[in-house]
Design a protein with these regions (language model features):
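Helicase-associated low-complexity/disordered flanking segments
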Residues: 1-58, 73-76, 80
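Conserved P-loop/Walker A NTP-binding site and adjacent catalytic elements of P-loop NTPases
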Residues: 19-21, 43, 52, 57-139
Length: 139
C-alpha cells in the first residue's frame, strides 16, 4: 500500500481536537444539579420549551414580565447540554441588568459569579474559561 500522506494529514488535523474534547468533558462536569422555582410559569412549561429548543434552530418565548424567561431559559439550555462547545450568550439592554441577571442565575445554580455564570459589560469582564453562560450588554 502506497503512503499518500493522507494518514499523516488526518493525524495532524485530529490532533488538535483532543484538547477540545477534554475541555468539553470538563465543562460538562461542572454543571451542578439544576432546579426550577415552581412558582414561575416558565418552570411549569420547561419540558415544552426544552423540546422546542432541541427541535428548532430559532425559538421565540413570550411571557409576562416576571415569568422566568430571563433566569430559567439559560438553565434549560444548560440542562440540554448547551454551553459545552462554547458559551451561551445572554444579552441584556443595560449594564446593571446584565450584572444582576448573572448574579441571580449563579445564585440559583449555587455557584460563584464568574465561574459557570459570568457577565461582561463595557470594560468589566467577570467570567472565566469555565464560564458556560455569559450575560452581556448588546453594545
Amino acid at each position: 500500500v502506497a503512503d499518500t500522506g493522507l494518514d499523516r494529514s488526518h493525524e495532524r488535523s485530529t490532533a488538535g481536537r483532543n484538547p477540545s474534547r477534554r475541555a468539553q468533558a470538563r465543562r460538562a462536569v461542572v454543571v451542578p444539579p439544576i432546579t426550577y422555582p415552581e412558582q414561575l410559569p416558565v418552570s411549569a412549561r420547561r419540558r415544552e420549551i426544552s423540546a422546542a429548543i432541541r427541535d428548532h434552530q430559532v425559538v421565540i418565548v413570550a411571557g409576562e414580565t416576571g415569568s422566568g424567561k430571563t433566569t430559567q431559559i439559560p438553565k434549560i439550555l444548560l440542562e440540554l447540554g448547551r454551553g459545552r462547545d462554547g458559551q451561551i450568550g445572554h444579552t441584556q439592554p443595560r449594564r446593571i441588568a446584565a450584572r444582576t441577571v448573572a448574579e441571580r442565575i449563579a445564585f440559583e445554580l449555587g455557584t460563584s459569579l464568574g465561574e459557570i455564570v459570568g457577565y461582561q459589560v463595557r470594560f468589566t469582564d467577570e467570567s472565566s474559561e469555565r464560564t458556560l453562560v455569559k450575560v452581556m450588554t448588546d453594545g
